[in-house]
């Protein structure tokens, strides 16, 4: 049975394992995410999300296969992006650091997690959804496009300590059209 729930302290080691598996896959050349082992994401990334009560995990049969951070925090580079929809900060929900264990790819866990994020946004009264990803991350960009997210701009930045990142910003409006 698949369930998405708030993360707990006992999930941190498993989330770190997923980060490490992604770093290993990137180093082997089987995926291109644009992350750097030891820089981002790290155990501290998951711990900070947990401490802020913003870490969510997807578990199937008791094993965590996906995780992400959901909050209202818009990174500074978002100010330079031409968002189609304007919303007050408290009406914008952002998904950060969505990860799926590479060994569980193809099971729909990424889609399920994004759908959960959308349901949470509706429950919180947030009509504007924003996500960012490295321009190198073609798999995430395909997933988000498939789920109805629109790429609104790309901004060069230092992303969590990684220089030279081209950050693709995406949005989806859940409110009524204006």
Task: Pin down the residues of each PLM region.
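Conserved GNAT-fold acetyl-CoA-binding loop/helix
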Residues: 16, 23-45
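Conserved beta-hairpin
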Residues: 54-68
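Conserved acyl-donor/pantetheine-binding loop and adjacent beta-alpha core of acyl/acetyltransferases
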Residues: 69-97, 102-105, 158-163
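C-terminal "cap" of GNAT-fold acetyltransferases
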Residues: 87-89, 127, 134-138, 145-147, ...
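Conserved acetyl-CoA-binding loop-helix of GNAT-fold acetyltransferases
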Residues: 100, 106-119, 142, 146
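Conserved GNAT acetyl-CoA-binding A-motif
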Residues: 114, 121-132
């Amino acid at each position: 049975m698949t369930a998405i729930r708030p993360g707990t302290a006992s999930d941190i080691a498993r989330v770190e394992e997923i980060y490490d598996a992604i770093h290993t896959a990137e180093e082997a050349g089987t995926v291109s995410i644009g992350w750097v082992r030891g820089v981002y994401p790290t155990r501290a990334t998951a711990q900070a999300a947990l401490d802020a009560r913003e870490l969510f995990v997807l578990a199937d049969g008791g094993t965590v296969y996906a995780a992400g951070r959901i909050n209202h925090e818009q990174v500074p580079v978002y100010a330079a992006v031409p968002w189609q929809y304007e919303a007050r900060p408290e009406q914008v929900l952002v998904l950060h650091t969505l990860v799926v264990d590479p060994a569980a790819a193809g099971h729909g866990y990424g889609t399920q997690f994004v759908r959960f994020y959308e349901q949470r946004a509706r429950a919180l009264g947030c009509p504007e959804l924003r996500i960012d990803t490295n321009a190198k991350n073609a798999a995430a960009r395909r997933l988000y496009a498939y789920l109805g997210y629109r790429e609104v701009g790309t901004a060069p930045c230092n992303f969590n300590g990684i220089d030279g990142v081209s950050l693709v910003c995406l949005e989806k409006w859940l409110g009524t059209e204006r």
